[in-house]
Amino acid sequence: MMWKALLIAVLAIAHCQAVLETDANTLVLLDNLAIRETHSIFFKSLQDRGFKLTYKLADDSSLLLSKYGEYLYKNVIIFAPSVEEFGGDVSVERLAQFVDDGGNVLVAGSEKSGDALREFASECGFELDEENAAVIDHLHYDVSDAGEHTTILTSAKNLIQADTIVGKANRQADAAPLLYRGTGLIADKENPLVLKLLTAESTAYSYNPEASVSDYPHAVGRGTLLIAALQARNNARVVFSGSLLFFSDESFTTAVQYAQSGVFHKLAGNRDVAESISKWVFGETGRLRVASVQHHKEGELLPPDQAYTITDPVVYTIGIEELVQGEWRAFKASDIQLEFVRIDPFVRTYLKQTNTGAYQAKFKIPDVYGVYQFKVDYNRVGYTHLYSTTQVSVRPLEHTQYERFIPSAFPYYTSAFSMMIGVFVFSFVFLHFKDEPVGRAAKEDKKSQ
Protein backbone atom coordinates (compact mmCIF):
# COMPACT_ATOMS: atom_id res chain seq x y z
CA MET A 1 0.00 0.00 0.00
CA MET A 2 2.91 2.32 0.70
CA TRP A 3 4.19 2.14 -2.85
CA LYS A 4 0.72 2.90 -4.20
CA ALA A 5 0.46 5.98 -2.00
CA LEU A 6 3.94 7.06 -3.11
CA LEU A 7 3.01 6.57 -6.75
CA ILE A 8 -0.15 8.64 -6.34
CA ALA A 9 1.85 11.41 -4.66
CA VAL A 10 4.43 11.43 -7.46
CA LEU A 11 1.69 11.59 -10.10
CA ALA A 12 -0.03 14.41 -8.22
CA ILE A 13 3.21 16.38 -8.06
CA ALA A 14 3.84 15.77 -11.76
CA HIS A 15 0.32 16.93 -12.53
CA CYS A 16 0.91 20.15 -10.63
CA GLN A 17 3.96 20.95 -12.78
CA ALA A 18 1.83 22.90 -15.23
CA VAL A 19 4.73 24.95 -16.56
CA LEU A 20 7.25 23.82 -19.13
CA GLU A 21 10.80 23.39 -17.84
CA THR A 22 12.10 26.03 -20.25
CA ASP A 23 9.62 28.60 -18.90
CA ALA A 24 10.18 27.99 -15.17
CA ASN A 25 12.93 30.48 -14.31
CA THR A 26 11.35 33.61 -12.86
CA LEU A 27 12.96 36.74 -11.41
CA VAL A 28 10.99 38.40 -8.60
CA LEU A 29 11.89 42.05 -7.92
CA LEU A 30 10.68 43.41 -4.57
CA ASP A 31 10.65 46.73 -2.77
CA ASN A 32 11.66 44.90 0.39
CA LEU A 33 11.85 41.28 1.47
CA ALA A 34 8.76 41.70 3.66
CA ILE A 35 6.65 41.50 0.48
CA ARG A 36 7.80 37.91 0.14
CA GLU A 37 5.92 37.18 3.37
CA THR A 38 2.86 39.36 2.77
CA HIS A 39 2.36 37.75 -0.65
CA SER A 40 3.45 34.23 0.28
CA ILE A 41 0.26 32.50 -0.93
CA PHE A 42 0.67 33.89 -4.43
CA PHE A 43 4.36 32.97 -4.60
CA LYS A 44 3.66 29.49 -3.22
CA SER A 45 1.04 28.88 -5.91
CA LEU A 46 3.69 29.66 -8.52
CA GLN A 47 6.20 27.30 -6.91
CA ASP A 48 3.59 24.55 -6.69
CA ARG A 49 3.07 24.88 -10.43
CA GLY A 50 6.77 24.37 -11.08
CA PHE A 51 8.18 27.88 -11.25
CA LYS A 52 11.68 28.52 -9.93
CA LEU A 53 11.56 31.90 -8.20
CA THR A 54 14.64 34.04 -7.62
CA TYR A 55 13.95 36.89 -5.16
CA LYS A 56 15.92 40.12 -5.48
CA LEU A 57 15.55 43.71 -4.34
CA ALA A 58 14.60 45.91 -7.28
CA ASP A 59 17.58 48.22 -6.72
CA ASP A 60 20.11 45.43 -6.15
CA SER A 61 23.34 46.34 -7.96
CA SER A 62 24.01 42.68 -8.85
CA LEU A 63 20.84 42.20 -10.91
CA LEU A 64 21.32 40.34 -14.20
CA LEU A 65 18.73 39.55 -16.84
CA SER A 66 21.07 37.84 -19.26
CA LYS A 67 24.50 36.27 -19.34
CA TYR A 68 26.67 35.44 -22.33
CA GLY A 69 23.91 36.61 -24.65
CA GLU A 70 21.23 34.35 -23.17
CA TYR A 71 18.44 35.33 -20.81
CA LEU A 72 18.61 33.79 -17.36
CA TYR A 73 14.86 34.11 -16.88
CA LYS A 74 11.74 33.61 -18.95
CA ASN A 75 9.50 35.64 -16.63
CA VAL A 76 9.88 38.71 -14.43
CA ILE A 77 7.63 39.73 -11.53
CA ILE A 78 7.93 43.33 -10.32
CA PHE A 79 6.32 43.85 -6.93
CA ALA A 80 8.27 47.04 -6.25
CA PRO A 81 5.91 49.99 -6.69
CA SER A 82 8.15 52.67 -5.20
CA VAL A 83 11.33 51.85 -7.13
CA GLU A 84 12.74 54.93 -8.83
CA GLU A 85 15.52 53.18 -10.71
CA PHE A 86 16.32 49.50 -11.16
CA GLY A 87 19.71 48.21 -10.13
CA GLY A 88 22.38 46.28 -11.96
CA ASP A 89 21.65 45.15 -15.50
CA VAL A 90 17.92 45.87 -15.22
CA SER A 91 16.46 49.08 -16.61
CA VAL A 92 13.31 50.18 -18.38
CA GLU A 93 15.06 49.80 -21.73
CA ARG A 94 16.30 46.31 -20.84
CA LEU A 95 12.83 45.27 -19.71
CA ALA A 96 11.35 46.56 -22.97
CA GLN A 97 13.98 44.59 -24.88
CA PHE A 98 13.21 41.57 -22.71
CA VAL A 99 9.57 41.76 -23.84
CA ASP A 100 10.63 42.27 -27.46
CA ASP A 101 12.65 39.06 -27.17
CA GLY A 102 9.65 37.09 -25.90
CA GLY A 103 9.83 37.49 -22.12
CA ASN A 104 6.78 37.83 -19.87
CA VAL A 105 6.36 40.46 -17.15
CA LEU A 106 3.89 40.85 -14.27
CA VAL A 107 3.89 44.27 -12.57
CA ALA A 108 1.98 45.53 -9.54
CA GLY A 109 2.01 49.22 -8.66
CA SER A 110 0.36 51.40 -6.05
CA GLU A 111 -0.67 54.98 -5.33
CA LYS A 112 3.00 55.86 -4.87
CA SER A 113 4.44 54.19 -7.98
CA GLY A 114 7.91 55.36 -8.89
CA ASP A 115 9.25 56.68 -12.17
CA ALA A 116 10.63 53.30 -13.23
CA LEU A 117 7.19 51.67 -13.31
CA ARG A 118 5.63 54.70 -14.98
CA GLU A 119 8.19 54.64 -17.77
CA PHE A 120 7.82 50.91 -18.29
CA ALA A 121 4.02 51.25 -18.32
CA SER A 122 4.22 53.87 -21.06
CA GLU A 123 6.42 51.51 -23.08
CA CYS A 124 3.62 48.93 -22.90
CA GLY A 125 0.74 51.22 -23.82
CA PHE A 126 -0.49 52.04 -20.30
CA GLU A 127 -0.35 55.14 -18.16
CA LEU A 128 -0.37 55.20 -14.37
CA ASP A 129 -2.39 58.02 -12.86
CA GLU A 130 -0.67 60.86 -11.05
CA GLU A 131 1.34 60.21 -7.90
CA ASN A 132 -0.84 59.75 -4.79
CA ALA A 133 -3.92 59.23 -6.97
CA ALA A 134 -6.08 56.29 -5.89
CA VAL A 135 -9.23 54.70 -7.26
CA ILE A 136 -12.17 56.03 -5.23
CA ASP A 137 -15.71 54.68 -5.17
CA HIS A 138 -18.19 56.20 -2.72
CA LEU A 139 -20.79 53.49 -3.37
CA HIS A 140 -18.79 50.27 -3.72
CA TYR A 141 -16.24 50.22 -0.92
CA ASP A 142 -15.43 47.64 1.74
CA VAL A 143 -16.35 47.96 5.41
CA SER A 144 -12.65 47.85 6.26
CA ASP A 145 -12.07 51.15 4.46
CA ALA A 146 -10.50 53.87 6.61
CA GLY A 147 -12.88 56.57 5.40
CA GLU A 148 -11.36 57.65 2.09
CA HIS A 149 -13.32 55.00 0.14
CA THR A 150 -10.17 53.75 -1.57
CA THR A 151 -10.50 50.12 -0.45
CA ILE A 152 -13.05 49.31 -3.10
CA LEU A 153 -14.93 46.24 -4.28
CA THR A 154 -15.50 45.67 -7.98
CA SER A 155 -17.85 43.09 -9.40
CA ALA A 156 -16.55 40.04 -11.25
CA LYS A 157 -18.70 41.08 -14.22
CA ASN A 158 -16.13 43.82 -14.85
CA LEU A 159 -13.56 41.19 -15.84
CA ILE A 160 -12.72 40.79 -19.51
CA GLN A 161 -14.85 38.27 -21.38
CA ALA A 162 -11.97 35.89 -21.99
CA ASP A 163 -12.12 32.66 -20.00
CA THR A 164 -8.56 31.79 -21.02
CA ILE A 165 -7.23 34.81 -19.12
CA VAL A 166 -9.45 35.20 -16.05
CA GLY A 167 -11.13 31.79 -15.79
CA LYS A 168 -14.72 30.93 -16.64
CA ALA A 169 -15.82 30.34 -13.04
CA ASN A 170 -14.51 33.72 -11.93
CA ARG A 171 -16.94 35.53 -14.23
CA GLN A 172 -20.11 33.84 -12.96
CA ALA A 173 -22.96 36.01 -11.70
CA ASP A 174 -22.56 34.68 -8.16
CA ALA A 175 -18.76 35.13 -8.09
CA ALA A 176 -17.33 37.08 -5.16
CA PRO A 177 -16.28 40.70 -5.76
CA LEU A 178 -12.63 41.66 -6.06
CA LEU A 179 -10.82 43.68 -3.40
CA TYR A 180 -8.70 46.52 -4.74
CA ARG A 181 -6.70 49.38 -3.28
CA GLY A 182 -4.38 51.23 -5.60
CA THR A 183 -4.10 53.66 -8.47
CA GLY A 184 -5.96 53.72 -11.75
CA LEU A 185 -4.57 52.84 -15.17
CA ILE A 186 -5.31 54.53 -18.46
CA ALA A 187 -4.93 52.59 -21.71
CA ASP A 188 -3.65 53.98 -24.97
CA LYS A 189 -6.73 53.95 -27.21
CA GLU A 190 -4.58 53.71 -30.33
CA ASN A 191 -2.84 50.54 -29.16
CA PRO A 192 -4.82 47.50 -30.41
CA LEU A 193 -2.68 45.11 -28.38
CA VAL A 194 -3.85 46.38 -24.97
CA LEU A 195 -6.40 44.23 -23.11
CA LYS A 196 -8.63 45.63 -20.36
CA LEU A 197 -8.63 42.75 -17.88
CA LEU A 198 -10.46 44.47 -15.02
CA THR A 199 -12.29 47.79 -14.90
CA ALA A 200 -13.80 49.71 -12.01
CA GLU A 201 -17.49 50.27 -11.41
CA SER A 202 -19.24 53.11 -13.22
CA THR A 203 -19.27 55.12 -9.96
CA ALA A 204 -15.48 55.05 -9.49
CA TYR A 205 -12.82 57.57 -10.40
CA SER A 206 -9.10 58.01 -9.85
CA TYR A 207 -7.92 61.03 -7.89
CA ASN A 208 -5.88 62.08 -4.87
CA PRO A 209 -8.16 61.30 -1.89
CA GLU A 210 -6.51 63.97 0.24
CA ALA A 211 -7.22 66.77 -2.23
CA SER A 212 -10.47 68.39 -3.27
CA VAL A 213 -11.56 67.61 -6.83
CA SER A 214 -10.77 70.75 -8.80
CA ASP A 215 -9.96 69.20 -12.18
CA TYR A 216 -11.71 66.47 -14.11
CA PRO A 217 -10.14 63.11 -13.13
CA HIS A 218 -7.98 61.35 -15.69
CA ALA A 219 -9.89 58.09 -15.24
CA VAL A 220 -13.63 57.96 -14.59
CA GLY A 221 -16.11 55.07 -14.38
CA ARG A 222 -15.54 52.09 -16.65
CA GLY A 223 -12.69 53.97 -18.24
CA THR A 224 -10.72 53.39 -15.04
CA LEU A 225 -8.57 50.32 -15.55
CA LEU A 226 -7.55 48.33 -12.50
CA ILE A 227 -5.64 45.59 -14.32
CA ALA A 228 -4.49 45.80 -17.94
CA ALA A 229 -2.50 43.51 -20.19
CA LEU A 230 -0.49 43.58 -23.37
CA GLN A 231 0.12 40.68 -25.71
CA ALA A 232 2.86 41.76 -28.08
CA ARG A 233 3.04 40.72 -31.71
CA ASN A 234 5.69 38.16 -30.77
CA ASN A 235 3.21 36.71 -28.21
CA ALA A 236 5.14 38.04 -25.20
CA ARG A 237 2.76 39.01 -22.40
CA VAL A 238 2.73 41.87 -19.89
CA VAL A 239 0.18 42.36 -17.10
CA PHE A 240 0.01 45.62 -15.17
CA SER A 241 -1.97 45.99 -11.94
CA GLY A 242 -2.41 49.29 -10.16
CA SER A 243 -2.68 47.48 -6.83
CA LEU A 244 -0.06 45.44 -5.01
CA LEU A 245 -2.74 44.54 -2.47
CA PHE A 246 -4.62 42.60 -5.15
CA PHE A 247 -2.02 39.77 -4.97
CA SER A 248 -1.51 39.85 -1.20
CA ASP A 249 -2.39 37.26 1.44
CA GLU A 250 -4.75 39.82 2.95
CA SER A 251 -6.92 40.02 -0.15
CA PHE A 252 -6.78 36.22 -0.58
CA THR A 253 -7.96 35.36 2.93
CA THR A 254 -10.11 38.29 4.12
CA ALA A 255 -13.89 38.35 4.12
CA VAL A 256 -15.41 41.32 2.30
CA GLN A 257 -18.64 43.24 2.77
CA TYR A 258 -20.14 46.14 0.87
CA ALA A 259 -20.42 49.06 3.28
CA GLN A 260 -23.51 50.48 1.58
CA SER A 261 -25.61 47.39 0.79
CA GLY A 262 -24.21 45.13 3.51
CA VAL A 263 -23.77 42.18 1.12
CA PHE A 264 -21.24 39.82 2.70
CA HIS A 265 -18.83 37.33 1.13
CA LYS A 266 -16.63 34.91 3.06
CA LEU A 267 -13.73 35.55 0.72
CA ALA A 268 -12.92 38.00 -2.04
CA GLY A 269 -12.41 36.57 -5.51
CA ASN A 270 -8.82 37.81 -5.74
CA ARG A 271 -7.06 34.50 -5.29
CA ASP A 272 -8.70 32.64 -8.17
CA VAL A 273 -8.47 35.62 -10.49
CA ALA A 274 -4.83 36.29 -9.59
CA GLU A 275 -3.89 32.67 -10.23
CA SER A 276 -5.75 32.65 -13.56
CA ILE A 277 -4.04 35.86 -14.66
CA SER A 278 -0.62 34.57 -13.60
CA LYS A 279 -1.19 31.35 -15.57
CA TRP A 280 -1.97 33.38 -18.63
CA VAL A 281 0.82 35.94 -18.39
CA PHE A 282 3.44 33.24 -17.83
CA GLY A 283 2.20 31.16 -20.76
CA GLU A 284 0.58 28.27 -18.92
CA THR A 285 -2.74 28.90 -20.66
CA GLY A 286 -3.73 30.33 -24.00
CA ARG A 287 -0.67 29.03 -25.85
CA LEU A 288 -1.12 27.54 -29.31
CA ARG A 289 1.33 26.05 -31.76
CA VAL A 290 1.27 24.45 -35.20
CA ALA A 291 2.22 20.80 -34.84
CA SER A 292 2.06 19.75 -38.50
CA VAL A 293 1.01 20.97 -41.95
CA GLN A 294 0.16 18.74 -44.91
CA HIS A 295 -1.29 19.39 -48.35
CA HIS A 296 -1.80 17.17 -51.38
CA LYS A 297 -4.14 16.38 -54.23
CA GLU A 298 -7.32 14.60 -53.28
CA GLY A 299 -6.74 10.87 -53.50
CA GLU A 300 -2.96 11.18 -53.01
CA LEU A 301 -0.76 11.28 -49.91
CA LEU A 302 2.13 13.54 -50.89
CA PRO A 303 2.28 17.03 -52.39
CA PRO A 304 3.23 17.32 -56.08
CA ASP A 305 6.92 17.39 -56.93
CA GLN A 306 6.81 20.77 -58.64
CA ALA A 307 3.44 22.47 -58.75
CA TYR A 308 -0.28 22.04 -58.61
CA THR A 309 -2.37 22.43 -61.75
CA ILE A 310 -5.32 24.79 -62.02
CA THR A 311 -8.66 23.26 -60.94
CA ASP A 312 -6.90 20.46 -59.01
CA PRO A 313 -8.93 19.25 -55.99
CA VAL A 314 -6.66 19.64 -52.95
CA VAL A 315 -6.73 18.63 -49.29
CA TYR A 316 -5.08 20.85 -46.64
CA THR A 317 -4.51 19.52 -43.12
CA ILE A 318 -3.05 21.39 -40.15
CA GLY A 319 -2.45 20.13 -36.62
CA ILE A 320 -2.94 22.78 -33.91
CA GLU A 321 -2.06 22.10 -30.28
CA GLU A 322 -2.79 23.93 -27.02
CA LEU A 323 -0.69 23.82 -23.86
CA VAL A 324 -2.82 22.30 -21.08
CA GLN A 325 -1.34 21.39 -17.69
CA GLY A 326 2.16 21.40 -19.18
CA GLU A 327 1.21 19.06 -22.06
CA TRP A 328 0.50 19.83 -25.69
CA ARG A 329 -2.97 18.61 -26.60
CA ALA A 330 -5.19 18.97 -29.65
CA PHE A 331 -6.85 22.37 -29.76
CA LYS A 332 -10.61 22.50 -30.22
CA ALA A 333 -12.29 25.39 -32.02
CA SER A 334 -14.92 25.91 -34.69
CA ASP A 335 -13.82 29.27 -36.10
CA ILE A 336 -10.44 28.53 -37.70
CA GLN A 337 -10.25 29.60 -41.33
CA LEU A 338 -7.96 28.74 -44.23
CA GLU A 339 -7.17 31.18 -47.01
CA PHE A 340 -5.66 30.33 -50.39
CA VAL A 341 -3.95 33.60 -51.23
CA ARG A 342 -2.36 35.13 -54.30
CA ILE A 343 -2.07 38.77 -53.23
CA ASP A 344 -5.78 38.53 -52.33
CA PRO A 345 -7.59 35.43 -51.06
CA PHE A 346 -9.07 33.37 -53.90
CA VAL A 347 -10.49 30.82 -51.45
CA ARG A 348 -11.57 31.32 -47.85
CA THR A 349 -13.11 28.39 -46.00
CA TYR A 350 -13.54 27.01 -42.49
CA LEU A 351 -11.33 24.19 -41.29
CA LYS A 352 -13.17 21.21 -39.86
CA GLN A 353 -11.69 19.04 -37.13
CA THR A 354 -11.16 15.39 -38.04
CA ASN A 355 -11.24 12.32 -35.81
CA THR A 356 -7.48 12.58 -35.33
CA GLY A 357 -7.78 16.11 -33.89
CA ALA A 358 -6.26 17.84 -36.91
CA TYR A 359 -8.12 20.42 -38.99
CA GLN A 360 -8.85 19.82 -42.66
CA ALA A 361 -10.29 21.64 -45.65
CA LYS A 362 -11.01 20.44 -49.19
CA PHE A 363 -11.41 22.78 -52.14
CA LYS A 364 -10.67 23.17 -55.84
CA ILE A 365 -7.76 25.34 -56.91
CA PRO A 366 -8.93 28.42 -58.85
CA ASP A 367 -8.62 28.56 -62.63
CA VAL A 368 -5.84 31.14 -62.30
CA TYR A 369 -2.19 30.15 -62.24
CA GLY A 370 0.51 31.82 -60.14
CA VAL A 371 2.24 31.58 -56.75
CA TYR A 372 -0.16 30.98 -53.85
CA GLN A 373 -0.04 30.49 -50.09
CA PHE A 374 -2.02 28.22 -47.82
CA LYS A 375 -2.57 30.70 -44.98
CA VAL A 376 -3.97 30.19 -41.47
CA ASP A 377 -4.16 33.39 -39.41
CA TYR A 378 -5.90 32.74 -36.08
CA ASN A 379 -6.02 35.64 -33.64
CA ARG A 380 -8.37 35.47 -30.66
CA VAL A 381 -8.33 37.32 -27.33
CA GLY A 382 -6.46 35.29 -24.74
CA TYR A 383 -4.65 33.03 -27.20
CA THR A 384 -1.28 33.40 -28.84
CA HIS A 385 -1.39 34.65 -32.40
CA LEU A 386 -1.26 31.57 -34.63
CA TYR A 387 0.14 32.24 -38.09
CA SER A 388 1.12 29.61 -40.64
CA THR A 389 1.84 29.98 -44.36
CA THR A 390 2.90 27.41 -46.95
CA GLN A 391 3.85 28.61 -50.43
CA VAL A 392 2.96 26.56 -53.51
CA SER A 393 2.99 27.12 -57.26
CA VAL A 394 0.00 26.63 -59.54
CA ARG A 395 0.66 26.11 -63.27
CA PRO A 396 -1.72 26.17 -66.24
CA LEU A 397 -2.77 23.03 -68.09
CA GLU A 398 -0.34 21.47 -70.55
CA HIS A 399 -1.49 21.35 -74.17
CA THR A 400 -2.17 17.63 -73.84
CA GLN A 401 -4.37 18.14 -70.79
CA TYR A 402 -7.04 20.33 -72.35
CA GLU A 403 -10.39 18.77 -73.28
CA ARG A 404 -11.05 18.09 -76.94
CA PHE A 405 -14.20 20.15 -76.86
CA ILE A 406 -14.66 22.84 -74.27
CA PRO A 407 -18.34 23.25 -73.29
CA SER A 408 -18.02 27.01 -72.96
CA ALA A 409 -16.90 27.15 -76.62
CA PHE A 410 -19.97 25.36 -78.01
CA PRO A 411 -21.45 28.61 -79.42
CA TYR A 412 -18.24 29.19 -81.36
CA TYR A 413 -18.22 25.60 -82.57
CA THR A 414 -21.83 26.01 -83.75
CA SER A 415 -20.98 29.26 -85.50
CA ALA A 416 -18.02 27.71 -87.32
CA PHE A 417 -19.87 24.58 -88.44
CA SER A 418 -22.95 26.57 -89.49
CA MET A 419 -20.71 28.79 -91.60
CA MET A 420 -19.11 25.74 -93.21
CA ILE A 421 -22.48 24.19 -93.97
CA GLY A 422 -23.79 27.49 -95.34
CA VAL A 423 -20.79 27.87 -97.66
CA PHE A 424 -21.20 24.27 -98.83
CA VAL A 425 -24.91 24.74 -99.62
CA PHE A 426 -24.26 28.04 -101.34
CA SER A 427 -21.44 26.52 -103.41
CA PHE A 428 -23.60 23.51 -104.34
CA VAL A 429 -26.48 25.73 -105.50
CA PHE A 430 -24.20 28.14 -107.26
CA LEU A 431 -22.37 25.40 -109.17
CA HIS A 432 -25.37 23.29 -110.17
CA PHE A 433 -27.98 25.93 -110.98
CA LYS A 434 -27.89 27.16 -114.65
CA ASP A 435 -30.04 29.90 -116.25
CA GLU A 436 -31.16 29.40 -119.92
CA PRO A 437 -30.13 32.08 -122.50
CA VAL A 438 -32.79 34.72 -123.07
CA GLY A 439 -32.47 34.83 -126.98
CA ARG A 440 -32.92 31.10 -127.48
CA ALA A 441 -36.03 31.00 -125.35
CA ALA A 442 -37.64 33.78 -127.51
CA LYS A 443 -37.00 31.87 -130.79
CA GLU A 444 -38.59 28.74 -129.43
CA ASP A 445 -41.66 30.75 -128.44
CA LYS A 446 -42.03 32.10 -132.02
CA LYS A 447 -41.77 28.63 -133.54
CA SER A 448 -44.42 27.32 -131.28
CA GLN A 449 -46.77 30.05 -132.45
From Swiss-Prot:
It is a single-pass type I membrane protein. The chain crosses the membrane at residues 413-433. Keywords: Endoplasmic reticulum, Membrane, Signal, Transmembrane, Transmembrane helix. Residues 19-412 are lumenal. Pathway: Protein modification; protein glycosylation. InterPro entries: DDOST_48_kDa_subunit (IPR005013), OST48_MD (IPR055459), OST48_N (IPR055457). It comes from the Eukaryota. Its main location: endoplasmic reticulum. It holds the Pfam family OST48_N. One of its GO terms (biological process) is protein N-linked glycosylation via asparagine. One of its GO terms (cellular component) is endomembrane system. Residues 434-449 are cytoplasmic. It is found in: Endoplasmic reticulum membrane. Component of the oligosaccharyltransferase (OST) complex. PANTHER family: DOLICHYL-DIPHOSPHOOLIGOSACCHARIDE--PROTEIN GLYCOSYLTRANSFERASE 48 KDA SUBUNIT. This is Dolichyl-diphosphooligosaccharide--protein glycosyltransferase 48 kDa subunit. The gene is Ost48.
